[in-house]
Amino acid sequence: MKLIVVSGRSGSGKTVALRVLEDLGYYCVDNLPVSLLFQLVAELRGKYDQIAVSIDVRNLPATAEDLVSILDEIRQHQDLQFSSFFFDADNATLLKRYGESRRLHPLSRQQFTLAQAIRQETDLLSPLSSSADLRIDTSHISIHELSEQIRERVLGKKEHELVMVFESFGFKHGIAKDADFVFDARFLPNPHWIAELKPLTGLDEPVQRYLQSQPDVVKYINQLISLLETWLPQLERNNRSYVTVAIGCTGGQHRSVFIAEQLANHFLVLGKNVQRRHRTLEKLHAPG
């Protein structure tokens, strides 16, 4: 099991970090008391392989020694791949961020001014800062740059992996509303009008052979591939987690299924993270 503890001064980027880790498949828990870390790990063991926990200044043990002891014990746990990330920014940047957000600092309720609260937080979080495996100063980087740094550390590569979802649907059942791209295949030759192909789907070999023999179908698929390959790098750089490409035909049984499969197979061969979904076929085979 992998466990990442996210900490840092308030306003430095912990929330962004936790959101990125969630996108990367981590089960995330916000503001967990340090004393409950082992209980959480025991509860989630076998259910999740990757856990991320954020800790802020309100959830620390009573003493710095207790905090160090808990962290040391976690690091020595044989069944855990433990790492800790600490986020920080200079005092001027934190003051500016709080001024813009108009949020209260977690220590403000202790009658501290904002500047005093920021300094006090520095002292309280010192054990977490000094023992962190990764420290990121967010003073002069954007949210997107911070996200990329976290992904690079977690994945071992700079760009995060975009999930490409290819789905088919039938216009007569309603357009796919969750799609980023919608392409219409209703103008292409329709296997529905061929008696022996009508009861089949785009997943069946006779339908596939028929559509592969149609020049317009092949041309359309190649043009869609060219379009997606042209803009895919930009989508990846834009910090997208998913891009959904929907292909529609009249009923969602033949042409759209075939084209969605062809696109999915093409990008799968290129090493992309691909998912496929056939809305009409799922309805036809749904229980009840």
UniProtKB/Swiss-Prot annotation:
Source species, domain of life:
Bacteria
Please indicate if the UniProt record lists Repeat as a keyword: no
Binding-site residues, GTP: 56-59
Residues engaged in binding ATP:
8-15
Protein task? Displays ATPase and GTPase activities.
Which NCBIfam families does this UniProt record tie to the protein?
PRK05416.1
| Entry's family note | Belongs to the RapZ-like family.
Q: What is this protein called?
A: Nucleotide-binding protein Tola_2941
Positions the record marks as coiled coil are none
For this UniProt record, the keywords arranged alphabetically read as follows:
ATP-binding, GTP-binding, Nucleotide-binding
Query: Can you name one GO molecular function term for this protein?
Result: ATP binding
